[in-house]
Amino acid sequence: MKVYGLIGKPVSHSLSPVMHNALFRKYGIDAVYVTFEVEELGKAIDGVRALGISGLNVTMPYKEVVTKFLDELSEDAREINSVNTIINLEGSLIGYTTDGVGARKALERFTEIEGRNVLILGAGGAGKAIAYELSKIANIVVLNRTPSKAKSLEKFGVKGGSLDELPNYVGWADVLINATSVGMGTNESLVPRRLLRRELIVMDIVYKPLKTRLLRDAESVGCRVIDGLWMLIYQGAESFKLWTGIYPDVELMRRVSLERLGKG
């Protein structure tokens, strides 16, 4: 039996085991997906090699720091210095990022994204990956609490700035994406409701709660909203394909996730 898993801190909230284990069953793959709450990342990666764990997802707070423990990075992962998927290839650990593609596919499920103006809040591992991927097809502004981190993405043709500049850019945006953890398990939002307008498409990468404060506010003014579960599903589907060669059933992933959340 092959073992796959998720490393991060915290990980107990994750829906990844529910999704991937359902997929292993569907496709008759002798494998299991588990979570590992990790305190010491370097030792955990040594354990992956020693135990022969076949593959990993990586979540907060390790998406960037994990890169220095790996043997090889995909071009995208190297460009943004962020990894959320690892393949163990006969003891050689190769890092990939599927966050950007996951976000793009989630958006494209609901709207045309090419040539649109996209405002991304947050320049951490997920925010960077989303900005890098969408910069290939759309106009991107990234705002971050630490502006220098957002400005470091300007090499990809995006504009970076401070979250304090939010009121200046919401009117410009066709799509707004919260790529921070603000709203996870709290009733907080980075975006005051008064700045939202009904033409805006609003996406949140947070999926617990499924309807964050940001999405509730956006719905209340008539915006189209995309919950964080869609991005989780599509980035997870890309990870599954890297591990198995199979692009999986995303509708099954959504269904089992909603059942676990009690919203099936």
Swiss-Prot record:
Pfam families (alphabetical): SDH_C, Shikimate_DH, Shikimate_dh_N
Keywords: Amino-acid biosynthesis, Aromatic amino acid biosynthesis, NADP, Oxidoreductase
Biological process annotations from GO: amino acid biosynthetic process; aromatic amino acid family biosynthetic process; chorismate biosynthetic process; shikimate metabolic process
CDD domains: NAD_bind_Shikimate_DH
Record: residues binding NADP(+): 75, 122-126, 144-149, 205, 228
Positions of the catalytic residues: 63
Record-listed E.C. numbers: 1.1.1.25
Broad class of enzyme this protein falls into: oxidoreductase
MF annotations from Gene Ontology: NADP binding; shikimate 3-dehydrogenase (NADP+) activity
Function text: Involved in the biosynthesis of the chorismate, which leads to the biosynthesis of aromatic amino acids. Catalyzes the reversible NADPH linked reduction of 3-dehydroshikimate (DHSA) to yield shikimate (SA).
Family: Belongs to the shikimate dehydrogenase family.
PANTHER family in the record: BIFUNCTIONAL 3-DEHYDROQUINATE DEHYDRATASE_SHIKIMATE DEHYDROGENASE, CHLOROPLASTIC (PTHR21089:SF1), SHIKIMATE DEHYDROGENASE (PTHR21089)
UniProt-recorded name of the protein: Shikimate dehydrogenase (NADP(+))
Lineage of source species: Archaea, Methanobacteriati, Methanobacteriota, Thermococci, Thermococcales
